[in-house]
């Protein structure tokens, strides 16, 4: 459970950093690009990926995990770009809701792809998790206009993209000792995609964005690392990790927003936190209690 807790803490720290970055004139796109450089560095020196004596390109061509790191390398930066467009055309509240509700896809995958046993406690836990998410994501939307076609496409892209990334990280966890190489290559490809995108936009690079990206990369790397290790620790219970990570981040994020940024927590939001904690309890403890 400690890996999941560390992953949640790092994820919330990433969110806090991104929120502060917008106020410090850090260009998020540039920070994301250099975040991947940091992640590549940590992957290489801390995880020590084993390329089986092959050249980098040969390993990519021959590895059975090629579809995973190719998909991650493309999706990680692409979903960020899609998220920024969704925020632009549909608003941050709707975009955040789409990201959190993407939990539906990995939960579905847990039973259909990863063949997790569907028990009564898991059904109760999943239902409580979605009720909790609904309560936590219900916020005032005054002043928001109707969503146009571009906004709808952006929200669908966010929902689908984040859901698929969660499923892919579970697949990375299943690769066992090969996951360091998979992460290293995924981050490398993601960096290439992001830098190409920024160079095509002909951006003016800023030192504050580079520094912010380095800090972001440290937090993001450990967020992903602990998330994968959580999946490895609970190999037979992916629902716990998928739901625990998602609702854990939004619960802690909501409380952090209130304490640090003086954001208001409504009674419905507090109810959502209670439902969410109950969901984690059911997913982790209820089967053991019944047994």
Swiss-Prot record:
The chain crosses the membrane at residues 1-21, 26-46, 67-87, 95-115, 117-137, 149-169, 179-199, 208-228, 241-261, 270-290. The keyword Membrane applies. It is a multi-pass membrane protein. GO terms for cellular component: membrane; plasma membrane. It comes from the Bacteria. It is found in: Cell membrane. Coiled coil: none annotated. Residues 107-138 form the EamA domain. Keywords: Cell membrane, Membrane, Transmembrane, Transmembrane helix. This is Uncharacterized protein HI_1376. The lineage of its organism: Bacteria, Pseudomonadati, Pseudomonadota, Gammaproteobacteria, Pasteurellales.
């Amino acid at each position: 459970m400690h890996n999941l807790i560390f992953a949640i803490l790092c994820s919330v720290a990433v969110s806090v950093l991104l929120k502060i970055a917008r106020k410090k004139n850090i260009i998020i796109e540039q920070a994301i690009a250099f975040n991947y450089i940091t992640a590549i560095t940590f992957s290489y020196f801390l995880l020590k990926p084993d390329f089986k004596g092959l050249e980098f390109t040969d390993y990519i061509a021959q590895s059975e995990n090629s579809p995973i790191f190719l998909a991650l390398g493309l999706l990680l930066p692409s979903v960020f770009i899609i998220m920024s467009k969704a925020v632009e055309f549909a608003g941050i509240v709707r975009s955040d809701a789409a990201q959190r509700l993407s939990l539906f896809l990995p939960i579905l995958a847990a039973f259909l792809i990863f063949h997790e046993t569907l028990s009564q406690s898991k059904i109760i836990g999943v239902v409580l998790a979605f009720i909790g998410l609904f309560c936590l994501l219900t916020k005032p939307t005054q002043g928001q206009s109707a969503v146009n076609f571009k906004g709808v496409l952006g929200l669908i892209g966010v929902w689908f993209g984040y859901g698929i990334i969660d499923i892919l990280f579970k697949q990375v966890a299943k690769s066992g000792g090969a996951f360091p190489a998979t992460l290293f290559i995924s981050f490398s490809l993601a960096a290439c995609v992001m830098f190409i995108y920024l160079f095509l936009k002909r951006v003016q690079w800023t030192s504050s964005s580079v520094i912010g990206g380095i800090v972001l990369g440290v937090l993001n790397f450990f967020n992903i690392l602990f998330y994968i290790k959580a999946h490895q620790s609970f190999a037979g219970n992916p629902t716990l990790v998928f739901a625990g990570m998602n609702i854990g981040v939004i619960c802690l994020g909501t409380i952090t927003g209130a304490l640090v940024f003086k954001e208001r927590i409504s009674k419905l939001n507090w109810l959502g936190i209670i439902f969410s904690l109950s969901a984690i309890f059911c997913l982790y403890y209820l089967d053991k209690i019944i047994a």
